[in-house]
From Swiss-Prot:
Organism of this sequence: Caulobacter vibrioides (strain ATCC 19089 / CIP 103742 / CB 15)
Protein name: Imidazole glycerol phosphate synthase subunit HisH
Gene: hisH
EC number per UniProt: 4.3.2.10, 3.5.1.2
GO molecular function terms listed in the Swiss-Prot or TrEMBL record: glutaminase activity; imidazoleglycerol-phosphate synthase activity; lyase activity
Organism superkingdom: Bacteria
Intracellular or extracellular location(s): Cytoplasm
Function: IGPS catalyzes the conversion of PRFAR and glutamine to IGP, AICAR and glutamate. The HisH subunit catalyzes the hydrolysis of glutamine to glutamate and ammonia as part of the synthesis of IGP and AICAR. The resulting ammonia molecule is channeled to the active site of HisF.
Assembly with partners or alone: Heterodimer of HisH and HisF.
Domain Glutamine amidotransferase type-1: 3-213
InterPro entries (UniProt xref): Class_I_gatase-like (IPR029062), GATASE (IPR017926), Imidazole-glycPsynth_HisH (IPR010139)
CDD domains, alphabetized: GATase1_IGP_Synthase
Length: 213
């Protein structure tokens, strides 16, 4: 049985994410133990790492540092090459830095900055809330069986802008395009909430549980 460490660092709707991961595993008949944890030892030994996150970039980074799990995550992801996925602010934390409330260092696992959305249509509001279509930029195992143009659920005021376009997997549009998904080697992140995105979101989570980068 594979162990999936769902990181508890004081940010993110953990129960919704846990429930969705369990349902995704059930639908594919996958033997996965979804563990909500802030235990560095468990994280370091996990077979997969999943990082949620809601709120401000700086507070999420501070919460991650306070738990002491960053080094364990780094050991698992870069030391052993286990698959990693971040969602919403967990996805944004992959960046080099976030520009919300000043400059806050990110994990720098995907080079780039997290910048505020600036729609070119004055009728569009921030935060960007609700369903939006994604455009797949390139094929990726995480989006296997998910249609180009699939609708996902977003709740964001900021977005990760990667320094290298080859790290972008999908985009969405809110008065201008922004990055909806990134992937590099065994690291991936999505700006939307797969746990709120119904069948397409569950398909993505199931793909993550089967992903072998």
């Amino acid at each position: 049985m594979q162990t999936v460490a769902l990181i508890d660092y004081g940010s993110g709707n953990l129960r919704s994410a846990e429930k969705a991961l369990r349902e995704a595993a059930r639908r594919r008949a996958l033997d996965a133990d979804i563990v909500v944890t802030a235990d560095p030892d468990l994280v370091a030994k996990a077979d997969r790492v999943f990082l949620p996150g809601v709120g401000a970039f700086a507070s999420c980074r501070a919460g991650l540092d306070a738990t002491g799990v960053y080094e364990a995550m780094n050991q698992a992801v870069h030391g052993r090459g286990v698959p990693f996925m971040g969602i919403c602010v967990g996805h944004q934390l992959l960046a080099t830095e976030g520009l919300e409330f000043g400059v806050t260092p990110g994990l720098n696992w995907i080079q780039g900055q997290v910048k505020k959305l600036e729609p070119n249509d004055p009728t569009l509001t921030i935060p960007h809330m609700g369903w939006n279509a994604i455009s797949l930029v390139r094929p990726h195992a995480l989006f296997a069986g998910i249609d180009d143009g699939a609708h996902m659920y977003f709740a964001n005021s900021f977005a990760l802008t990667p320094s290298h376009v080859e790290d972008v997997v999908a985009t969405a549009d809110h008065g201008g395009p922004f990055t909806a998904a990134v992937a590099k080697d065994n690291v991936a992140g999505v700006q939307f909430h797969p746990e709120k995105s119904q069948a397409s979101g569950l398909a993505l989570l199931a793909n993550f549980l089967e992903w072998r980068p």
